[in-house]
Amino acid sequence: MPQMAPISWLLLFIIFSITFILFCSINYYSYMPNSPKSNELKNINLNSMNWKW
């Protein structure tokens, strides 16, 4: 029964909210996609104009 144990519920809510936000932000910003290099982009653009029909 929570009435018998006066726990600071607001403090617990703030702590859990901060940890949840930190966890989500770490997961979001930890993924770094590989960006293509400029030489690869030039090759892709040249090869894409070679139509086979």
Swiss-Prot record:
Compartment(s) where it occurs, according to its Swiss-Prot or TrEMBL record: Mitochondrion membrane
Cited Pfam families: ATP-synt_8 (PF00895)
Keyword field: ATP synthesis, CF(0), Hydrogen ion transport, Ion transport, Membrane, Mitochondrion, Transmembrane, Transmembrane helix, Transport
GO cellular component: mitochondrial membrane; proton-transporting ATP synthase complex
UniProt topology in membrane: Single-pass membrane protein
Keyword hit for Isomerase: no
GO biological process terms on file: proton motive force-driven ATP synthesis
InterPro entries: ATP8_metazoa
Highest taxon, organism lineage: Eukaryota
Family stated for the protein in its record: Belongs to the ATPase protein 8 family.
Subunit structure: F-type ATPases have 2 components, CF(1) - the catalytic core - and CF(0) - the membrane proton channel.
General function of this protein: Mitochondrial membrane ATP synthase (F(1)F(0) ATP synthase or Complex V) produces ATP from ADP in the presence of a proton gradient across the membrane which is generated by electron transport complexes of the respiratory chain. F-type ATPases consist of two structural domains, F(1) - containing the extramembraneous catalytic core and F(0) - containing the membrane proton channel, linked together by a central stalk and a peripheral stalk. During catalysis, ATP synthesis in the catalytic domain of F(1) is coupled via a rotary mechanism of the central stalk subunits to proton translocation.
Name of this chain's protein: ATP synthase protein 8
